[in-house]
Every structure is written in structure tokens, then in C-alpha cells.
């Protein structure tokens, strides 16, 4: 345990010194540095294990991770990362001073995607415009089931609507046959008496 703690502290110090040097080299120039991980877990500059062990040991270098769901088959849609830093000094500003610790997972195609992480500084391609920029992105609406059959993710859909059929209204048959008496029923006379005549 002591070896692991010592190694984690050493790696945290190396990362802190490296991030300070990075900020001093690129301050005010408007150039961004982009480190990426391919979908198979190979990091460009070889510090993936260092960052993960420092985060596991509770170091100060905590990087938020954003998951952006992309199209499942085919990656024709270009997805942009969402800025996760708060305030005006961090992230992709046009003055080139701040650097934000951003890690995001961009999905595209059927094999997952890639993770692009760490220290984007300066003018990120010249597309960001300062303080009025939105900190969110608009994703297409739809119901997509991630990893079907492997976990408890649910698909949300609208409740079913049933078609309404208007049935014709017609008179119902009588419930019982009523007895209708003849005209001479209950008269006070003989058998053929037709009643009083005036």
C-alpha cells in the first residue's frame, strides 16, 4: 500500500509540473494541444495509466468525463464536445490563457468511439466566441437502446394509442312481448256482446 501511495503522489507531482509547463508554453498563442485515445485504449502520449492511478489515489487532477451518444451505424454526423468548466477563465477561450481539463467520449459508428481528453488550451480552431457561447449541445431526439440485452437500460416510448371506432346506433329489440288485450276483454255481456250501442 505504501508503494502504491508513493507512486501515486509521484505521478500527481509529475502531472502538476507538466500542466504548469504546458500553461507557460502556450499562454497567449491561441494553439491547442489535443491528446486522444483510440477506441482500443491506446493513448497518444503514454500518460493514461498515470492519470488513472492519480485519480484512483484521490489526486487533485480530476477530469470530468462527458458521454455523447452518436449514431449507431455510420458516423456521418460531426459531434462537438460540451464545455464542462464553469466560470470565465477556463476552457476554450479566444484569449488563449486558460486551459480546461476536459475529457469526453465521442460515440460514432458501431465500435464505440474515442476518448479525447486533457488540457485543451487557447483558441480551439477559432470557432468559440467568448462569454456568450452556450455550454450545451443539441442532440437529435429518438429512442435508442444502448447495449440491448446486457443491462437494465429502458427504452422510453409514448403510450399506445388505440383507434376509436364509431359504431352505428339502432333500436334494440323489445325485452319481452307484451300482452295486448282484445276490445271485448272485460266487458259485461255475453260472448258476442259488442258493448253498449247508443
UniProtKB/Swiss-Prot annotation:
Its main location: secreted. Keywords: Secreted, Signal. It is found in: Secreted. Residues 1-16 form the signal peptide. It comes from the Eukaryota. InterPro entries: Chorion_2. It holds the Pfam family Chorion_2. Chorion membrane (egg shell) protein; plays a role in protecting the egg from the environment. This is Chorion protein S19. It comes from Drosophila virilis.
Amino acid at each position: 500500500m505504501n508503494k502504491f501511495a508513493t507512486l501515486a503522489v509521484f505521478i500527481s507531482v509529475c502531472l502538476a509540473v507538466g500542466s504548469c509547463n504546458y500553461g507557460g508554453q502556450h499562454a497567449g498563442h491561441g494553439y491547442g494541444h489535443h491528446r486522444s485515445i483510440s477506441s482500443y485504449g491506446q493513448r497518444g502520449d503514454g500518460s493514461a495509466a498515470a492519470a488513472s492511478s492519480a485519480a484512483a489515489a484521490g489526486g487533485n487532477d480530476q477530469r470530468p468525463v462527458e458521454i455523447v451518444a452518436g449514431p449507431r451505424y455510420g458516423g456521418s454526423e460531426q459531434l462537438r464536445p460540451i464545455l464542462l468548466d464553469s466560470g470565465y477563465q477556463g476552457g476554450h477561450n479566444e484569449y488563449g490563457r486558460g486551459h480546461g481539463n476536459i475529457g469526453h467520449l465521442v460515440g460514432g459508428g458501431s465500435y464505440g468511439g474515442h476518448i479525447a481528453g486533457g488540457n485543451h488550451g487557447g483558441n480551439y480552431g477559432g470557432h468559440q466566441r467568448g462569454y456568450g457561447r452556450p455550454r450545451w449541445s443539441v442532440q437529435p431526439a429518438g429512442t435508442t437502446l444502448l447495449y440491448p440485452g446486457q443491462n437494465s437500460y429502458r427504452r422510453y416510448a409514448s403510450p399506445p394509442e388505440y383507434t376509436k371506432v364509431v359504431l352505428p346506433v339502432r333500436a334494440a329489440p323489445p325485452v319481452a312481448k307484451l300482452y295486448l288485450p282484445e276490445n271485448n276483454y272485460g266487458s259485461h255481456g255475453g260472448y258476442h256482446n259488442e258493448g253498449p250501442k247508443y
